[in-house]
Design a protein with these regions (language model features):
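A generic local secondary-structure boundary/capping motif
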Residues: 4, 60-62, 93-96, 110, ...
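Residue "hotspots" at secondary-structure boundaries inside conserved domains
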Residues: 61-63, 69, 98, 128-130, ...
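Flexible glycine-rich active-site/ligand-binding loops centered on an Asp-His dyad
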Residues: 91, 98-101, 105-108, 151-177, ...
Length: 285
């Protein structure tokens, strides 16, 4: 199943995409208003649905206000791990020469989330080195702690796409990554959230275009740490909750991997596409 969160008649609603036509949306009755309500309900979705056309709504992030922010995994594609460590921007204690021995985990606050089509402020008063990162993100569907790898997929509800926008100068200057990762608007998310049956984790393409130029192109088969491994490690002594979102890392081809580095500028358009999840597109000012 494929869900979107929308604004319709001045109300935030969550909708189910019609299987035969993604432009035909079934609004789930209130009080359901975001994907979190769908995840909490499990299989008990209310009916009947009110059907509308996608042109009659504004698409929002699947979860416009995450309960606990977003957990993110850094340097989880081998080629990106190498390009980042060689870029001169990694001054953190996680600095590696080839790939990390354990998942590198950081977070983005909920205020960083914006939806598809949102115009992202480059915040020049705070940073001059804004970079893009295409990522597949995983939604957790039930509480769990100390989750074994072999059971981890039982805790996954589904997936979405995010752009883990990063202020590279702040990431380098402060060594820990939080201040470079969680600026306002620096986590575009969407356009939809899909259940696990829609995505083949062993073979899902992740791409990113900047102004129609292909910059990132990889497959989830290239992940250093798999989704089950990531969930197992994060849940060690830490209870994951329904609606928690885990971004799985970005492929090679980010701006700092270019020679010279190519950072985003006003007027740029970034288009992230993940197979069977959709296209997340945002412009920058």
């Amino acid at each position: 199943m494929r869900f979107v969160t929308v604004r319709h008649d001045d109300h935030q609603r969550v909708a189910l995409e019609a299987e035969s036509d993604p432009h035909h949306l079934g609004l789930i009755p209130l009080p359901f208003s975001s994907l979190l309500d769908v995840i909490d309900a499990g299989n008990a979705l209310p009916s009947p649905l009110e059907w509308v056309n996608v042109s009659d709504v504004q698409l929002l992030a699947p979860v416009p206000s995450p309960r606990r922010g977003i957990l993110c995994v850094g340097m989880n594609y081998r080629a990106h791990s190498l390009e980042f460590s060689q870029s001169g921007f990694d001054s953190s204690s996680s600095k590696v020469t080839e790939h990390p021995d354990f998942p590198i985990v950081f977070s983005k606050f909920g205020a960083s989330v914006v939806g598809p089509g949102a115009i992202v402020d480059l915040l020049p008063q705070a940073t001059s080195q804004v970079d893009y990162e295409a990522e597949l993100a995983v939604f957790i569907k039930k509480p769990g702690r100390d989750i074994p790898i072999e059971e981890a997929m039982n805790f996954v509800w589904g997936y979405t796409a995010i752009n883990d926008i990063t202020a590279r100068d702040r990431q380098k200057r402060h060594q820990q990554w939080l201040l470079g990762k969680t600026l306002d608007g620096f986590c575009p998310m969407g356009p939809r959230a899909v259940t696990t049956d829609e995505v083949d984790l062993a073979n899902t393409r992740v791409t990113c275009h900047v102004n129609d130029e292909l910059r990132q192109d990889a497959n989830t088969s290239d992940l250093i740490f798999s989704v089950p491994e990531i969930i197992s490690v994060i849940s060690e002594g830490f209870t994951l909750q329904p609606g928690d979102l885990i971004a799985t890392g970005t492929p090679a081809g980010v701006g700092i991997g270019q020679d010279p580095p190519r950072f985003l500028k006003a007027g740029d358009q970034v288009r992230i596409e993940i197979s069977n999840v959709g296209v997340l597109e945002n412009s920058f000012k």
